Amino acid sequence: GQGERKMRLDKYLKVSRLIKRRTVANDACDAARITVNGKSAKASYQVKTGDIIEIAFGQRTMKVEVLEIAEHALKADAAGMYREIL
């Protein structure tokens, strides 16, 4: 096998457009507003497919499953990098 693709959490959040700016993603990680698989995750966490990311946006929490990891995603493709779990 060629090994799993991984990507830093802050970068994944930006490329997938879950969070528009990487600095915001970093701050969210630092403030422990982001968990991966139920555990608080730092910006340097290596995201892999199948991970469940939860992001707390004020009153709302968004929970997504990582479907794919791509270095660069066009806006149309970005949504395909994850699926929201309701």
Predicted regions: what is each one?
Residues Q59-L86:
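C-terminal structural segments of small proteins and small subunits
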Residues I52:
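Glycine-rich, charged/polar anion/phosphate-binding loops
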Residues G1-K6:
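Short, Lys/Arg-enriched N-terminal segments with co-localized hydrophobic residues
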Residues M7-T49:
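A basic, amphipathic helix-loop patch mediating RNA/tRNA/ribosome contacts
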